[in-house]
A protein has these predicted regions:
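Predominantly flavin-linked oxidoreductase catalytic cores and closely associated redox partners
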Residues: 103-104, 110-207, 212-221, 288-291, ...
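Conserved mixed alpha/beta catalytic, RNA-binding, or beta-rich assembly cores of soluble enzyme
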Residues: 21, 111-114, 120, 127-129, ...
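FAD-binding core/adjacent interface of flavoenzyme oxidoreductases
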Residues: 1-8, 66-155, 231-239, 250, ...
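Beta1-alpha1 glycine-rich phosphate/pyrophosphate-binding loop at the start
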Residues: 3-67, 71, 143, 152-198
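A Rossmann-like FAD-binding core segment of flavoenzymes
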Residues: 67, 72-89, 94-96, 173-260, ...
């Protein structure tokens, strides 16, 4: 089997990349999805809040996915469901398997990786205590309730204040459960401010910052959860314990980009994002293999995933048509206050209008300036009244400014203000 482009993942990232590649003249495209339907995680996100940037209207997750799925059908783009990709070779040969076709070897001129991300589990955070039933990741509980029609519990405690945890606090409340509290290890929430307002404050659900779970009690089913305040080293403070009677503990303790295939292929990874190192075209360290969406870094909004994936799809089309320009790479370095940047490097020759750089900060900051520097010269200077790790930031660097860069790297950092 031979294709011009193979997209691995039929979620919002994969769909947007495939559609954009077709719009840019790529004929033979195949989308491979391991679930039984297209749309990815959106199919279980039945709440609203999607599409405000992309469609200028508020949609639910399935409605947002449906618009892209319909477009895929209209453009007659081929796809395979219930299909597991086993590996991708550096020569862009995809090994995949399903029950209908059996084992397949698919040759591609270009590949887009759009596998999304997965949740961290109890094992990844080493919570002490017994191992009864009733402990779920927030996303698993979301799928059970919204898609499978099962109620996971009646008295619930949520560890972690990521967006999925906040949304599930509201969802469980609406389904009749009593949400005792949301508990967060860090001194700040990992979720969007609007989700804290709409999911916790509106339903009087308490949020305990700088707290964590220190014990889990229960034989067959979860019976009690003990939380405690933590010090600046994130160690529990004796004497601050609070015990809750509950039958369910939901974990919203972070998302990890799903990069098992990327690592197997030998793609260069960034330990800060847990995703591939990409350039201005969302191309990885292996020419012709592109990556987009949550497989690169975890996004706040699906609208941003769609926009980034379109860039990857258009770039893959350029690669297939042999229109990529050669050039010297310039690196993007993280300065004070910046956890990571995406892309990590760029070639001016392939930036048509602007270079969009996405980043997260490492703490809560107020009244700062976000600066981009070429050596000692400040080339972009933005006022930022409020910055938080839970909200992704973006800097747009115009092509004209990029052309004037003299060094082989630019530095993005925070300057001045209050921490």
């Amino acid at each position: 089997m031979k294709y011009d482009l193979v997209v691995i993942g039929g979620g919002p990232g994969g769909l947007a990349a495939a559609i954009e590649a077709r719009n840019n003249g790529v004929e033979k495209i195949l989308v491979i999805e391991r679930d039984k339907e297209l749309g990815g995680i959106l199919q279980q996100c039945i709440h609203n809040g999607f599409g405000l940037h992309e469609f200028k209207e508020e949609l639910t997750g399935p409605e947002y996915a449906e618009r892209f799925i319909k477009k895929l059908y209209e453009l007659n783009i081929e796809y395979k469901l219930d299909t597991m990709v086993l590996e991708v070779s550096p020569e862009k040969i995809i090994h995949a398997i399903n029950t209908k076709d059996g084992y397949m070897m698919i040759e591609a001129k270009a590949v887009v990786l759009a596998m999304g991300c997965r949740e961290r589990t109890r094992g990844a955070i080493a919570i002490p205590g017994e191992r009864p039933s009733g402990i779920f990741t927030a996303g698993t509980a979301q799928r059970f309730i919204n898609m499978e029609g099962y109620m996971v519990g009646k008295k619930v405690l949520i560890l972690g204040s990521g967006d999925i945890g906040l949304i599930m606090a509201r969802r469980m409340t609406l389904e009749g459960a009593e949400v005792k509290a949301v508990v967060e290890l860090m001194p700040f929430s990992g979720g969007l401010a609007r989700n804290i307002a709409q999911c916790l404050n509106d339903y009087d659900i308490p949020l305990y910052l700088s707290h964590t779970v220190v014990d889990i009690k229960g034989k067959e089913r979860l019976e009690k959860v003990v939380i405690a305040k933590v010090d600046e080293n994130r160690r529990p403070i004796p004497g601050t314990e609070i015990e809750y009677d509950c039958d369910t503990l939901l974990l919203s303790v972070g998302l990890i980009p799903e990069n098992d295939i990327s690592r197997k292929t030998g793609i260069g990874m960034d330990r800060r994002t847990n995703g591939p190192v990409v350039n201005e075209m969302m191309e990885t360290s292996i020419p012709g293999i592109f990556a987009c969406g949550n497989v690169v870094h975890v996004h706040d909004l699906v609208d941003f995933v769609s926009a980034e994936s379109r860039r990857a799809g258009a770039a893959a089309a350029k690669y297939v048509k042999d229109e990529v320009k050669a050039g010297e790479y310039k690196n993007i370095k993280n300065g004070f206050g910046i956890t990571y940047t995406v892309p990590q490097k760029f070639r001016v020759e392939n930036v048509e209008n602007n270079l969009e750089v996405f980043m997260r900060v490492n703490n809560i900051y107020k009244n700062m300036r976000l600066q981009v520097k070429d050596g000692d010269k400040v080339i972009v200077n933005l006022k930022k009244p409020h910055l938080a790790p839970g909200e992704m930031e973006k800097v747009i660097i115009p092509n004209k400014i990029l052309q004037s860069i003299t060094g082989n790297e630019i530095v993005i950092e925070l300057v001045g203000g209050d921490e």
